[in-house]
């Protein structure tokens, strides 16, 4: 007889048999894979001892490809087929991609999504990212000589549902079981929280190759709560490379036209940037088709050329603190994440803003992968005690459209996830059997000023009087930040739902703009909402009155009918204007003018109900 093994939920059946779970930092410039071995999180090296894998894929033809260092080495001579910084393309449309002209490979638009033209054909960012993830998966399986149980993959804090879903799709294509997606700052907090047993409020300043994130986290007794986020998904070390390349070309007067020359200048710019981390000056040198670009570059020149980029990061930090209602002095420390934070001007700018030196006791290139590995180890059931609770937040409010084009927020901005929130709605017209739902994202009061996420329809609502149906709309945001919306008519049980997967995401600049607009137009939005609500109430009153007149108008005398008709005409005229108070006044006037009619209808209804019935039967 076969025996069933019973174990604690979430724990491996055999306490001596550990599941192999890894953390993956899928970065714009570099990617890493880490795992917990002998109780310590560490990054896994390749066969040459290198833990970093450049996030680069070169397509030679339909069958052959190079990934990582080999691809990067061939970038200068085959720039058109060497794809770097693909993370910037994840879940985006062509119009959203910044610095397209500086990219050495060709982007195309397919069905609203950006793709890349290569020697192997048209490739999506998901397919290209899958090549990188698969390489890291093979590295981990070779290290442990076994199959992986799963992986925790990190994403920027501001990745929205579409970008997160694209990351999960890439992982699935690479043969990985995704245990969870967590934000990069949260992963860094895990690594620092465990190593230092620190509690309090911290800022995680994460400047990677292609994205910048600032997160304000509260660490309390194993609970990691993100209380504010900000950043820029189109700002990173790559932009410092571009800025330096532009500066050198402007100083030397050189022109670059070919993709190979552009790639060569960028490679030289990156090398100079890295050298200036420790040196005060460096000789910039790039071999071009028409000769060579040579320039003696001082660190002060590099700092000045890239100061606007550094200032953008500090502006985002300042805004995140405002959102969290904190001052720089309220923080216990600042954690630096990402290889780009090695630049002296970054550390200096952060120290000047906060008035203290940032924490740098963990390798900024590795800290995100290490935190993801710790979380993966726990989700695999390898660490039963001391589990961490991770509380990320959603960046913009979620809601649905109501009558008049107004937004009813259901999940507020900065709500911690995972979460599920519900609200009841009803029908607008008598006999209504379907309800169209429009899911939106944003902070403004009018749908026209927010971002549309999805539309779906609840059908099969039993016909009943307007306002009688009870429809519960539930928003569920899972631990990966993915949204699903359901609507259920409580009486009949009919239900409809939608999983929200936007065709492409918002950049952090767009999110910041939406938030700023919501602040600057708050008074205007409030007035606009009041006007729309007044018009909706007026329309509802007119519909109800007309329905009553159609059904029981014979109860009225000529004078009574004339008074109501005149009052309805005044309300219709008022509703055409922009004076909310006047519309509200006309609505109340119609309500007063129909009070006697309502009483007559009620008496007539009671009389009909009692007609023909004997007293003893009541």
From Swiss-Prot:
GO biological process, one term: iron-sulfur cluster assembly
Xref: SUPFAM superfamilies: Actin-like ATPase domain, Heat shock protein 70kD (HSP70), C-terminal subdomain, Heat shock protein 70kD (HSP70), peptide-binding domain
GO molecular function (one): ATP hydrolysis activity
Coiled-coil segments on the chain, per record: none
Domain of life of the organism encoding this protein: Bacteria
Keyword Ribosomal protein: no
Annotated keywords: ATP-binding, Chaperone, Nucleotide-binding
PROSITE patterns, sorted: HSP70_1, HSP70_2, HSP70_3
Pfam family, one: HSP70
Record has ATP-binding as a keyword: yes
Function: Chaperone involved in the maturation of iron-sulfur cluster-containing proteins. Has a low intrinsic ATPase activity which is markedly stimulated by HscB.
Record-stated family: Belongs to the heat shock protein 70 family.
Protein name: Chaperone protein HscA homolog
Source organism: Variovorax paradoxus (strain S110)
Record gene name: hscA
């Amino acid at each position: 007889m076969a025996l069933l093994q019973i174990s604690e939920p979430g724990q491996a059946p055999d306490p001596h048999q550990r599941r192999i779970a890894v953390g993956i930092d899928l970065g714009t410039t570099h990617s890493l894979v880490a795992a917990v071995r002998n109780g310590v999180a560490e990054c896994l090296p390749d066969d040459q001892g290198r833990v970093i894998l450049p996030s680069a894929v070169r397509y030679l033809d339909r069958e052959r490809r190079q990934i990582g260092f080999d691809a990067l080495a061939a970038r200068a001579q085959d720039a058109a087929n060497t794809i770097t910084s693909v993370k910037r393309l994840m879940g985006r449309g062509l119009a959203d991609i910044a610095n397209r002209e500086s990219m050495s490979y060709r982007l195309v638009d397919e069905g609203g999504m950006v793709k890349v033209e290569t020697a192997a054909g048209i490739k999506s960012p998901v397919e290209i990212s899958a090549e990188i993830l698969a390489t890291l998966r093979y590295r981990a399986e070779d290290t442990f000589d076994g199959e992986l149980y799963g992986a925790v993959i990190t994403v920027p804090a501001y990745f929205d549902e579409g970008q997160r879903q694209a990351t999960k799709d890439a992982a699935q294509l690479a043969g990985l079981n995704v245990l969870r997606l967590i934000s990069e700052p949260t992963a860094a907090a895990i690594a620092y929280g465990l190593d230092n047993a620190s509690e309090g409020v911290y800022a995680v300043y994460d400047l990677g190759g292609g994205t910048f994130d600032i997160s304000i986290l509260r660490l309390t007794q194993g609970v990691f709560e993100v209380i504010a986020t900000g950043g820029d998904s189109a700002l990173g070390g790559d932009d410092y490379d571009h800025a330096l390349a532009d500066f050198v070309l402007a100083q030397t007067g050189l022109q670059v036209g070919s993709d190979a020359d552009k790639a060569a200048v960028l490679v030289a710019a990156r090398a100079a940037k890295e050298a200036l981390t420790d040196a005060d000056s460096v000789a910039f040198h790039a071999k071009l088709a028409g000769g060579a670009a040579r320039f003696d570059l001082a660190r002060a020149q590099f700092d000045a050329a890239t100061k606007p980029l550094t200032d953008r990061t500090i502006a985002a930090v300042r805004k995140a603190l405002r959102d969290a209602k904190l001052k720089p002095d309220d923080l216990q420390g600042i954690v630096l994440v990402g290889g780009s934070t090695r630049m002296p001007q970054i550390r200096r700018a952060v120290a000047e803003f906060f008035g203290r030196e940032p924490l740098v006791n963990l390798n900024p290139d590795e800290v995100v992968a290490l935190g993801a590995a710790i979380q993966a180890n726990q989700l695999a059931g390898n660490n039963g005690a001391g589990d961490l609770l991770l509380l990320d937040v959603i960046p913009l409010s979620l809601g649905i459209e109501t009558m008049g084009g107004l937004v009813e927020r259901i999940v507020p901005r900065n709500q911690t996830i995972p979460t599920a929130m519900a609200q009841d709605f009803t029908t607008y017209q008598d006999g209504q059997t379907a309800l169209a739902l429009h899911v939106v994202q944003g902070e403004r009061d009018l749908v026209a000023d927010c971002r549309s996420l999805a539309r779906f329809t609840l059908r099969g609502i039993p016909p009943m009087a307007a306002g009688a149906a009870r429809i519960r709309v539930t928003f569920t945001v899972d631990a990966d930040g993915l949204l699903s919306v359901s609507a259920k008519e409580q009486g009949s049980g009919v239900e409809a739902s939608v999983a929200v997967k936007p065709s492409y995401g918002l950049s952090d600049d767009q999110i910041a703009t939406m938030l700023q607009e919501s602040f600057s137009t708050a008074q205007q939005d409030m007035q606009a909402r009041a006007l729309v609500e007044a018009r909706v109430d007026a329309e509802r009153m007119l519909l109800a009155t007309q329905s009553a007149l159609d059904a029981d108008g014979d109860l009225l005398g000529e004078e009574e009918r004339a008074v109501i008709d005149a009052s309805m005409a005044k309300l219709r005229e008022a509703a055409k204007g922009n004076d909310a108070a006047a519309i509200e006044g006309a609505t109340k006037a119609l309500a007063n003018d129909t009070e006697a009619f309502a009483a007559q209808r009620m008496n007539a209804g009671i009389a009909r109900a009692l007609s023909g019935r004997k007293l003893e039967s009541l």
